[in-house]
Amino acid sequence: MSFKSLLKNLPKFFFLGLIHIYRWTISPLLGSPCRFFPTCSQYALQALKHHGCIKGLGFTIKRIGKCGPWHPGGVDLVPMTTLEESLDISPATNDDDSCDSQA
């Protein structure tokens, strides 16, 4: 990865790191199951990886806004930009730290 590319992706890496810290520290203490699949933190990881920082944060904020007793939950996948991406619906895992795909 070039220095220019690293600088461009720095905000995305920052937010990915914050989400991982949340998943390793705060999320286990909450103990309540998420009403959505994938979970909000998995959704945020996928949104940031597929759409970058600005769009990814937008999708994440919209998703977190749905979290509450007024919404039934269910399957809510990250919108994909191409048919090929939309066919890959595998959820992010705790050990998935790759940031290979970008929109």
From Swiss-Prot:
InterPro entries associated with the record: Membr_insert_effic_factor_YidD
Subcellular location: Cell inner membrane
Membrane topology: Peripheral membrane protein
Signal peptide span: none
Keywords of this entry: Cell inner membrane, Cell membrane, Membrane
Disulfide bonds: none
Membrane in keyword set: yes
Entry GO CC: plasma membrane
Main location class: membrane
Keyword Ion transport: no
NCBIfam families in the record: membrane protein insertion efficiency factor YidD (TIGR00278)
UniProt record similarity statement: Belongs to the UPF0161 family.
Function: Could be involved in insertion of integral membrane proteins into the membrane.
HAMAP family linked: UPF0161_YidD
Name of the protein in its database record: Putative membrane protein insertion efficiency factor
Organism ancestry: Bacteria, Pseudomonadati, Chlamydiota, Chlamydiia, Chlamydiales
